[in-house]
């Protein structure tokens, strides 16, 4: 067809994201991206031998649910000179710096109001993020792509479940519900916090400390502990 495929290569900058190890994606031991030191030679080879490709950009993503600007700044500062070099040598047009801006999970009761994302609640906001990375990115003269992800849709849904049984064990009380890790895996896999609130009001004196667990046949099937 005579059409060149536009491509961008993902670089692994080997930067610590400061998030859960399962959603850290920019360290040398992670499976994602091409080693930082190999990128320039890879682009040179592609420009020389893979003439059906159009080298359009460079991409990175260091992890998810980051709550500080420092890792983003460290990654951008490390990769920006590489992006500038690729622009000069190969004419790349964009630099995608990935996503990963974390959100607040503890404020679920207020998640229906705009203020949920404000400076008082969020550890990392769009303004602090931009203040950190823009000064390094602006001189590149490239289109900058960002992937906001959960920052946009994190409070868009709720899981509604029903308590089926209460088990009073010797060491713990368990509230067994009709939803589990197959519906919401973050607590079990990432030790993620999700606030649980009753749909109907109950007297405060009826509250007990318990694990909220699902029906899946393994001990990791929980939505909240204690």
Regions found by a protein language model. Give the residues of each.
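Active-site-proximal beta-alpha core segment in soluble small-molecule metabolic enzymes
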Residues: 1-96, 103, 164-166
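Flexible glycine/acidic-rich beta-alpha junction loops that bind and position SAM and/or redox cofactors
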Residues: 15-19, 93-114, 145, 150-156, ...
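Residue-level signature of transmembrane alpha-helix interfaces in integral membrane proteins
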Residues: 26, 75, 112, 116, ...
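Short secondary-structure boundary segments
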Residues: 33-48, 113-129, 194-198
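N-terminal low-complexity, intrinsically disordered patches enriched in charged
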Residues: 35, 42, 66, 72, ...
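Acidic, glycine-rich loop-and-beta core segments that form the ion-binding/anion-interacting portion
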Residues: 73-144
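Charged (often Lys/Glu-rich) extended helix/loop segments that serve as interaction or gating elements
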Residues: 126, 132-226
């Amino acid at each position: 067809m005579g059409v060149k495929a536009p491509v961008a290569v993902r670089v692994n900058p080997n930067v610590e994201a400061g998030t859960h190890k399962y959603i850290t994606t920019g360290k040398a031991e992670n499976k994602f991206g091409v080693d930082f030191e190999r990128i320039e030679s890879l682009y040179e080879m592609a420009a020389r031998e893979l003439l059906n490709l159009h080298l359009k950009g460079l991409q990175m993503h260091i992890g998810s649910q980051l709550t500080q600007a420092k890792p983003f700044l460290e990654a951008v500062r490390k990769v920006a000179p590489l992006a500038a070099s690729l622009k000069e040598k190969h004419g790349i047009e964009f630099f995608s710096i990935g996503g990963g801006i974390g959100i607040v999970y503890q404020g679920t009761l207020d998640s229906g109001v705009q203020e949920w994302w404000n400076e008082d609640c969020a550890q990392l906001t769009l303004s602090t993020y931009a203040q950190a990375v823009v000064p390094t990115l602006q001189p590149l003269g490239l289109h900058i792509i960002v992937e906001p992800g959960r920052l946009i849709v994190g409070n868009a849904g709720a899981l509604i479940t029903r308590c089926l049984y209460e088990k009073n064990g010797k060491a713990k009380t368990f509230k067994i519900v009709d939803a589990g890790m197959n519906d919401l895996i973050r607590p079990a896999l990432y030790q993620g916090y999700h606030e649980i609130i009753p749909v109907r009001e109950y007297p405060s004196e009826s509250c007990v400390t318990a694990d909220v667990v699902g029906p899946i046949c393994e001990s990791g099937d929980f939505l909240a502990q204690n």
